Amino acid sequence: MDVRQSIHSAHAKTLDTQGLRNEFLVEKVFVADEYTMVYSHIDRIIVGGIMPVTKTVSVGGEVGKQLGVSYFLERRELGVINIGGAGTITVGGQCYEIGHRDALYVGKGAKEVVFASIDTATPAKFYYNCAPAHTTYPTKKVTPDEVSPVTLGDNLTSNRRTINKYFVPDVLETCQLSMGLTELAPGNLWNTMPCHTHERRMEVYFYFNMDDDACVFHMMGQPQETRHIVMHNEQAVISPSWSIHSGVGTKAYTFIWGMVGENQVFDDMDHVAVKDLR
């Protein structure tokens, strides 16, 4: 488990390129037949990936010991979105088939969660966010057909994109975790511009569906002290509440956003005018 400490905005603005990457970038999300796990002190979110290839991968008691509990989800909820081939997730003996871009919410109290791929030639890639939970909500599968896509932006401003809200109150109940998937239309490069912050939530972006020769310049920092982190395919970045989170790519891309914090009101954000950015 890779533990990341919280960081003050006044400290963050003094960091060089490598310093910013050390604090906020999750460089390796998927490793064959293993789970990766980054624990952030910011709202206690855990971020990572699970890619079973030649065997199943389970997450249970061994992780619990690192969290000071008996098992991983004793006091946590889990959100998973599969960006790879078809797979299965077994929760408490019940097996869920999770296809490409299907998702599974796992409620607090699930003692063991087992991940598997259907075809080793095209393994599943389970990206997950995990947050503290105060009560148990039912485990539920969510498919792309069950989300309500919202298309925003314009080709003229190069930010035409479709937002798919997987784990939001309109779809299912969670304690605090919200997750969704945003896909840019071909030829569009910008996400979340004009940008915003949200004082009551932190957020993690996971960029994927990118060619090897492509990258995204992820914008972060306070609106008057912006910085950037260069992101490549299948990498994640942690965004504190005080930071903007936006990006521009060399080609179109897709990203998963996950938020935890005080509320789940999607529109509870502090907008920043482009003219006010520095």
From Swiss-Prot:
Recorded GO MF terms: 4-deoxy-L-threo-5-hexosulose-uronate ketol-isomerase activity; zinc ion binding
EC class name: isomerase
Residues the record lists as binding Zn(2+): 196, 198, 203, 245
Cofactors that this protein relies on: Zn(2+)
Gene3D superfamilies: Jelly Rolls (2.60.120.10), pectin degrading enzyme 5-keto 4- deoxyuronate isomerase, domain 1 (2.60.120.520)
Alphabetized UniProt keyword annotations: Isomerase, Metal-binding, Zinc
Enzyme Commission number(s): 5.3.1.17
GO biological process, one term: D-galacturonate catabolic process
InterPro entries registered for this protein in UniProt: KduI, KduI/IolB_isomerase, KduI_N, RmlC-like_jellyroll, RmlC_Cupin_sf
Catalytic activity field: 5-dehydro-4-deoxy-D-glucuronate = 3-deoxy-D-glycero-2,5-hexodiulosonate
Cofactor binding description: Binds 1 zinc ion per subunit.
Lineage: superkingdom: Bacteria
Pathway assigned to this chain's UniProt record: Glycan metabolism; pectin degradation; 2-dehydro-3-deoxy-D-gluconate from pectin: step 4/5
Cited Pfam families: KduI (PF04962)
Complex and partners: Homohexamer.
Function: Catalyzes the isomerization of 5-dehydro-4-deoxy-D-glucuronate to 3-deoxy-D-glycero-2,5-hexodiulosonate.
HAMAP family: KduI
Recorded family membership: Belongs to the KduI family.
The name this protein goes by in its record: 4-deoxy-L-threo-5-hexosulose-uronate ketol-isomerase
